[in-house]
């Protein structure tokens, strides 16, 4: 697996933008690598290179819940968008229905038990539903720095 937090490019292979700007947070590198493979552009992974990436360390802890909700919303939206882009709407719909139903049911189950989990599953459901309805990925956390 190649992670998108550290990548180097030979820009001669890219006439337009490298990343699809419809993605936010998730599946950007998966989409890029899929497009590279489709164009027979070689991808190299160097197993001898090590680096430290402190994920989620740039934000204040007081925003942790809002950021987690944002992450879950965008994961579901981006997953559907990726599948639609590369395999078609019906395939994406088939792959996402179980996530949509599961998120709805889990959100309902946690309605009285755990507010934080309920909000997470609500975000997953809404992200998936927005993607199915072909709405843009416009959800952002309400954070004032």
Regions found by a protein language model. Name each.
Residues 1-18, 22-50:
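A short, conserved alpha-helix in the catalytic core of glycosyltransferases
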Residues 16-17, 35, 81, 85, ...:
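Residue-level signal for well-ordered alpha-helical scaffold segments within enzymatic catalytic domains
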Residues 29, 75-79, 124:
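Alpha-helical packing segments of well-folded alpha/beta enzyme cores
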Residues 38, 42-119:
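Active-site-adjacent helix/loop segment of glycosyltransferases
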Residues 115-145:
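Membrane-interface aromatic/basic loop that binds lipid-linked glycans or pyrophosphate carriers
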């Amino acid at each position: 697996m190649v992670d998108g937090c550290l990548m180097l490019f030979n820009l001669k292979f890219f006439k337009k933008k490298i990343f699809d700007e419809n993605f936010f947070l998730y599946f950007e590198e998966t989409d890029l690598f899929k497009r590279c493979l489709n164009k027979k552009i070689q991808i190299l992974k160097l197993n001898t290179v090590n680096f430290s990436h402190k994920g989620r360390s740039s934000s204040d802890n007081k925003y942790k819940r809002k950021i987690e909700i944002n992450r879950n919303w965008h994961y579901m939206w981006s997953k559907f968008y990726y599948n639609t882009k590369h395999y078609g709407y019906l395939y994406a719909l088939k792959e996402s229905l179980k996530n949509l139903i599961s998120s709805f049911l889990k959100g309902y189950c946690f309605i009285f038990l755990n507010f934080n989990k309920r909000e997470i599953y609500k975000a997953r459901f809404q992200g998936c539903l927005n993607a199915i309805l072909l709405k843009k990925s416009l959800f952002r956390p309400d954070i004032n720095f």
